[in-house]
Amino acid sequence: MGACWLSCHLYEQLELDRFWAARLPDSREGTSWQHILQTLVCYRLIDPGSEWRLHRQWFEQSAMGDLLGEDYSLVSKNALYRCLDKVLPHKTALFSHLRQRWQDLFGATFDVLLYDLTSTYFESDPPDDESDKRRHGYSRDKRSDCVQVVIALIVTPEGFPLAYEVLPGNTADNTTLRGFLQKIETQYGKAQRIWVMDRGIPTDEVLAQMRQSDPPISYLVGTPKGRLTKLEQALLKRPWHEVRDGIDVKLLPDEQELYVLARSRARIDKERAMRQRKLKWLWSRLKELSTMRLTREELLMKLGAARTKARAAWRLVDIEIDPQIAAFSYALNRDRLRKVRRREGRYLLRTNLYEHQPAELWKFYIQLVEIEAAFKNLKGDLQLRPIYHQTIERVEAHIFVAFLAYCLHVTLRARLRPIASGLTPRAVLDKFVAIQMLDVHFPTTEGRTLILSRYTELNADQKLLVSQLDLELPPQPPPRITAAGQIARASAPAL
């Protein structure tokens, strides 16, 4: 009972019930599309799975029917799929609605926007329809053998999602930004926004257009370390500025931009430990291979496997393979190792924010972890995949439902932040799952059965959370009477 009730409360707090009531009216047969969508979203938040599982198992074992005043007919298989077909046209209106709710509930501001991309894959053959977005492309899930779609997401530094877009799986990262800039300006107007992005997303051409825009569009962008080689001599002459404990930056003004070299001592330790571990393994493996009696083909295959596993550490070792026999020699490239050591734990950023303090610039950039957390929650807690749908329209609707569930997740996290920052939304939902609705059966003299549904008493943790979140449990439901011979629901639902 508890998790369903809490999810419905979050849904209503975002006024999604009011938003969808105006856009998903009931059918002539009385099908409540908005209640079906609410069930899909709460299911995705609480115990994600397929629509088939929702239809066959989860709904009957949950309290969603009691909370919504609906019976099992609400989640007939066809109704679930037909509901998915109705939601996508309202995506843009939903973004505007959510922006206002984030502002009203939490005082969210939209001066700084974080932008990033992820992908989700499908274990299926490429579709014949050329307009289908499921395509092969660069896979962040390391599944280049599978077709995929790319998901672009914009969130605020506090993690409140503002918009997303589903793109073809073969979309190059650096071709996505221009379209998103135009969409945000069209929907919300031009404003003094700061866009924070990781390297590889904007091209030099797009950044130039952002600088020349009226008003100029501000940005802070990660830059590939290869550019550090060109700027290394100039940066050596610049002083370090401590912006916080363990974080130092150097500033290098250019003609139209400001370069920021950031150094994190904690990151240095982490990257150095990772590099040492990989290099130690590679050195041991090369020593092992040098003592094996292998054919030339076997040697090349094993060296290739070692290179794949060692990754960046492979470039720190010079390997010479004898062209005549199955033998090789190897030696540590100390010059390259010294160069790598100098760059460990360092980030090169570029921006047109000349007037901001170094500490502000660093704070903006590290907030990219919020969008990384969003992708982690979508793929982890909310189980974005596997996706079982066959058409791209329903695939996009599935992602849309996951996005709505993530909005509930973010709302709960924002509510927890000032009162219990150490608790995750998933931990709270798990605590509320333990609140059960029990059916107590009393036979009557007329041969009928009186059923009293009662939820279990809250334990200390649950009472504290209900109090701290300023919640009030719903009243105990009224008794029900079943006719003689009618089979009542035997299992107790989780509220």
Regions found by a protein language model. Give the residues of each.
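Anion-binding and metal-coordination hotspots
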Residues: 1-6, 11-495
